[in-house]
Amino acid sequence: MPVKEENASSQSLSQAIEDYLKAIYTLAGDQKAASTSAIAKRLKVSSAAVTAMLKRMSEAGLVRYQRRRGVMLTKVGTVLALETIRRHRLLESFFTDHLAMDWHQAHVEAETLEHFISRELEKLIDSKLGHPMSDPHGHPIPSAKGVVSKEALKPLTDLAAGTSAVVRRVSDEDAEHMRWWKKIGLVPGSPIRVREVGPFEGPLLIEIKGKSHHVGRKAVEGIWVASDGKRKKAVKPRKAAAKAGKR
């Protein structure tokens, strides 16, 4: 029936808008502008589709959009973005903690269901989980009032040789990376030490739970850490290579 088609179309548009709001906030927060190209890449859509949607969202008062200057969320847009992000991260936490889903599967399911759960179900999930502050990847879960906790973090790739740190956050954008990180123990809460930094943007030699791993920068650029303030003597390149060879 026409009415059902209209409702389905409206619902689909609402979901798309929530996806855009979430993408803009993730890329730029509520203080900076996100580029249309970055949004297109993140959502896997064309730049033309992004431009058309941003114009519609601007007319609805959700974003401030100027061509070639990017897009920023309005106060209303920020509130809606944080509500969607909260539902997504609560769902991910529930799926991993209570249904034993792996990170990627939980992320995919949350991408769909975040648009449909009621506020009452959201509250029940939050209560069941014990009101968590972060999701399985270490990303902060906005409070019901839209408050987001912040922590001074730096990319793992910025650490100098001999520096110890604690993993706080991992990107949820690449399934293969997530599986590999979890396999070697690069998960939120894990202490790590950078033993060696290769020259000219070379690979890193990191230590996790007593085991050493040579990792390329691209493979760990989605890892964010908090320094524990400890600085140990860096391992010399030749010695590190020799030890790695014995393993």
What do the predicted segments below correspond to?
Residues 1-44:
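Extreme N-terminal segment that seeds HTH/winged-HTH DNA-binding domains in transcriptional regulators
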Residues 48, 104:
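Key DNA-contact positions within bacterial/archaeal DNA-binding proteins
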Residues 51-55:
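Short, hydrophobic-biased segments on the C-terminal half of alpha helices
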Residues 58-66:
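A short, conserved structural fragment
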Residues 69-88:
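Basic, amphipathic "hinge/linker" alpha-helix immediately C-terminal to the N-terminal HTH DNA-binding motif
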Residues 114-222:
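Mid-protein regulatory/catalytic core that forms ligand/cofactor-binding pockets
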Residues 203, 212-213, 217-247:
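Glycine- and charge-enriched low-complexity intrinsically disordered segments
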